[in-house]
Amino acid sequence: MATYHSTRSRTAQLSAKEAIRRGIAPDGGLYVSDELGQSKIDLEGLANKDYFELAREVLGTLLPDYTADEIAACVDEAYGSTFASDEVTPVVDLKGVAGEADQGSAPAYVMELWHGPTSAFKDVALQMLPRLMARTSANAEGAADKIMIVTATSGDTGKAALAGFADAPGCGITVFYPEGKVSRVQELQM
């Protein structure tokens, strides 16, 4: 099973669930697995999968201590009804869009990342993370301890984090933002 250690030290070896639960290593580093470069994913096979299948396969490979059922539930909960597009992050052909270059130019595509509940690209991650955290062993059903997320924002991250953790079992969230330094819309969203 893959273990995770800090980018600043190899002292502590953690499971994926424990690394997700802790978030940041005690030395301030990020958690990473040495097996990341060794994990094999069939890239050609991914090309024909929808977002849900793709997410299940990639997350299942990178987070081996989560069961296939846990990963599937996280993916379905995170993206099933919270995104405006069934494709979650649709890739759109820019052909025919105003301002397109000459017909002889290379095809151009763009991935739309604003279909989440707060229209911020951060929704893609912040809808998944709370579901993964809610399934960490120390926060499993019936556990007495809770996870408290404390974060700061100067914009879209705050609302995306609040939306992601809003219904996460065993998790709470507090978002700080600088008074008068976020837009009125962002302030109202939070």
Listing of model-derived features with the role each one plays in the protein:
Residues 1-190:
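PLP-dependent amino-acid enzyme catalytic core
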